[in-house]
Each structure stands twice: as C-alpha cells, then as structure tokens.
C-alpha cells in the first residue's frame, strides 16, 4: 500500500482526554478517531490490526471445533424478560422502543438469543455437543467510558456458546476453549494470565478471566510467588488461620471519640492496633439489610458477601438506610446492641479479637474491650475479606503478590442457568427431557487491540508484534525527488510484496523527519530506509522493537528481512 493513498491522519500532540498510552497512541497514529464518548471509528490502519486479531480468533475457534454464525444486535425484550435479566442486568443494558412501543435491547451479550435459537432447533442428544460463535458489535451504557477502547459503549466482541447433554461434555469443551484462548493471546504476543474469576451477571459456576498484565488494568490479580495460582482479587479465598490470644477479657467500656470516624483515626486516638478494631458495614443484599464485620486492617469483599447469600445484587446501604436501621451515622457503626432481627455475619478473623474496639452506634463514641459472642452474637463466621499481599496462597504454595490486569477474555460454565429459565430442553438417550447444559466464552476483540497497544509501545510510538501489525515492512525513500531513491523504494516495495510481505511505501513528498516520526508512531516491525547510498545499492534496515539498525545490500535484503520476521 502506498502511503500517499492512505487515510492515516497523525497527531503531533497528545489529545487532552486520552489518559493512557494505548488511547493516546492509537489516536496520534491515526488508527482511530472518537465519534462520541466511548464510541470510536477504526481508520484503515486500525482496522487492519482489528482484522488480524479477528483472523487469529477465527482460526483458533475453528480449530477448537466452533462454528461461526451471526445474530442480531437488536434483541426482543421478551427474551431478556424470560431469562430474568431484563430486570437484573442494570442500567448498562441499552433499552429502546420501536414505533409500536415494543421494547428491545441493544445486545450487551447474546445468551438469550442463542438459547432461543438452539431450543427451537436442537431436540435430541444426538445433535450435541454444539459450539457456535460470532464476532459482532456489542453495546453497554457505561456510566463513565474511559481509556479509549478499554472501556467503551460500543465494542467488537467474539462470543461463543456451547450446548451439551452432560457435564463431562461441557468440561471437555471448556478445557478445549480455555486452551484456544491461551493460543489466541499468545499469538497476539501478549503477556497474560488466566485467573479464577467471578461470573457476575452472567451466572454459572466455574469461570476464568484472561488478563493482560498492565499497570492501567482495572482489575487486581492475586497470584502466588512460587506456583501457577492466579485469581481475580474478588475470588481469591483467604486460607489464613487466626489464633485467639490468652489475654483475659476486660469489662466493656464506652469511650468518647470526638470527630474520630475512620479506623485509622480511631485506632490512633485510642492507641489500639487496627487489627484489634472491628470494622462494621451495612450491605443491602437484594432487599435485605445485613451487618458485615471484618477486622480493622481488612476490607470487605462484596463478591464474597454476595456468594454467601446467593444474591443477585449486593451494594453498600445508603446513609439514610443505615440511619433508619441503627439510628446512627456510618462512622459510628458497631455490632453491640443491634436488634436481634438484624443478621450479623463476620469474617473469620473477627472471632479471634480479644478486647477490641468497635463503634457504639452513637455519634462520637466507641466501645473498647469488645469481645465477640460475649458482647454481640454473630450468625455466621465465614471468609468475607479481600486477600492481601503477603497472605498464604490459597493453593498452599508460596505467598500472594498483586498485579494489575486488563480483562480481554472470559470463559464460563453456565450450566443450566439459561436453559432452565427459558425451557431449552432436549431428549436424552433414555427419552427423558433434560435442560441443555451450556458454556459461554467471550473475547473483547477491540479491547485486545488496545491491550496490545498498551503493552507494546515506547516513547516514540506503537511497536506492533508481527502477527497483528498492519504491515510487516515500512519502506521509506528519504527524498522522492531523487530518481535513484524513488525507483529503488518502489522496486523493494514490489519485490517484498511478491514474497508475501505486507508493505507500506512512504511515497509522500515530506521531509525525512516527518516520515521517520510517522514511522515510529505507526510501529511496523521493520523499516527500510532508502537514502543517499541508494546509488551504491545499500539501504538501512531498522528493527522497531529493538531500535537496532544495519546497512544491507539490496540483493541481500529479502534474506535479511526473512530472518527478522521468521
């Protein structure tokens, strides 16, 4: 492709609203442009990268036995109502009405549509297992779109769905697609980890996220320093044991703590370590208010609270709800004196506290010498806190460290969550009606492009891995007015294309500095500069990833490039 014919508008300055490298560089290099908040156009170079990621995804999905189809982006509300998610999915689901006031959703995901499709066509175990996938635009009404393609309102996604007669069949396909995902992200050149995850609004049980390691990732990964264990911090269980001291219990005492609300303030004011304080929080679990206790140096994990109750929605109670429930402000909460009708659950660590402190449910006062079970009753002790760095790894090997990650893929064992809700059944080999067993497998295709750009860049621009680069080689005649340089550049361009390489020829009448700056921004793997030594049959070859350059004779160029790109 000749650069003079390409629509690739570059920017010299960093756009003001672009916070992270991938967003900045994809805009500056002319790979995309913003249409509205969280909505982007892919320009020609960006689209070439997107298509290369799509190709890798298709190859690995088909190798794993999945078959491609295409479902509608606009989905009837009745299907979502049938599954129950019309009411539970939340405000991220984009809803609309047609001229006849019939309700629809713009697809954030396609479980309902695919289940409806398959239940009408697959009636026998003889047609199972079946794995179908699509690559299609999805829509989510993000409250705060940010980070360019990493959190948008419109994005390209590959979603696959598998249907099975037995759990063993689901396990087999799940493992196969897990490996396919690992292959996809490895082929894209990414540094990633597969981690144990929460299924969230999707439902189901076993699930893994594929996380690209990056400091700008919105998720925290907890991983072992000596084993392969890795989990989203929300899902990492705490296996610590707590020993109760033999300190004698003291008499409960209420003390004034004026203007001291946070644990750090209270512990400093009372000269008590944070790990002897009891942090009390009120959560709304579906429609029920529950008091949750953790140790003062720990944080409540709301996903674990949700899983304790098998709830659909868990959120912090509002100040007004806390006031109505306990007649106190949030900063004075404590478990002592709470009405017996209100359930109190606590993390395991709370049970070992001796002579601790807690809020007194009265503004400006706390209790000291607090002892669980003597001073208040707990209905259940369980794992309710976030794991911390330095904790024992849940697999028993090593200690936990943290890293940030960008989620680019997610695989779920949905089980019968959707098939039972939507009456999607089949006849088994005994002629009995059974619900279809399902799996679900998603990849953020456009997000993967951003994740690659986030991992592969330097101070000068993008540095694309060969497998996804828009072109393999960038040929730059420095002076297009020079017949020797122009002709040699075109000859190299043509010969490399004949060898199967994708080549970009900078045939613009621009200054050398402009050409080189754009070349660094674009980040193609190999740059061939045709300069003053063209008359001698010599060009300069530069490897973008390493910055290494070498003068090469034209007759040796193809072999030299082949060694770089092998």
Swiss-Prot record:
The UniProt record lists the EC number as: 6.1.1.15
Supply one GO BP term: prolyl-tRNA aminoacylation
Q: What superkingdom heads the lineage? A: Bacteria
Q: Which PROSITE patterns match?
A: AA_TRNA_LIGASE_II (PS50862)
Which keywords does the record carry?
Answer: Aminoacyl-tRNA synthetase, ATP-binding, Cytoplasm, Ligase, Nucleotide-binding, Protein biosynthesis
Q: Where in the cell is it found?
A: Cytoplasm
Q: What class of enzyme is it?
A: ligase
According to the UniProt record, one GO cellular component term is: cytosol
Substrates-to-products reaction catalysed:
tRNA(Pro) + L-proline + ATP = L-prolyl-tRNA(Pro) + AMP + diphosphate
A Gene Ontology molecular-function term? aminoacyl-tRNA deacylase activity
Where would you say this protein principally sits, based on its record?
cytoplasm
InterPro entries, per this entry?
aa-tRNA-synt_IIb, aa-tRNA-synth_II, aa-tRNA-synth_II/BPL/LPL, Anticodon-bd, Anticodon-bd_dom_sf, Pro-tRNA-ligase_IIa, Pro-tRNA-synth_IIa_bac-type, Pro-tRNA-Synthase_IIa_type1
Q: Which NCBIfam families match?
A: PRK09194.1, proS_fam_II
Q: Record's HAMAP family?
A: Pro_tRNA_synth_type1
**What is written about domains in the entry's comments?**
Consists of three domains: the N-terminal catalytic domain, the editing domain and the C-terminal anticodon-binding domain.
This molecule's function is given as: Catalyzes the attachment of proline to tRNA(Pro) in a two-step reaction: proline is first activated by ATP to form Pro-AMP and then transferred to the acceptor end of tRNA(Pro). As ProRS can inadvertently accommodate and process non-cognate amino acids such as alanine and cysteine, to avoid such errors it has two additional distinct editing activities against alanine. One activity is designated as 'pretransfer' editing and involves the tRNA(Pro)-independent hydrolysis of activated Ala-AMP.
As for family, the record states:
Belongs to the class-II aminoacyl-tRNA synthetase family. ProS type 1 subfamily.
Assembly and partners? Homodimer.
Q: What's the name of the protein?
A: Proline--tRNA ligase 1
Which gene is transcribed and translated to give this protein? Answer: proS1
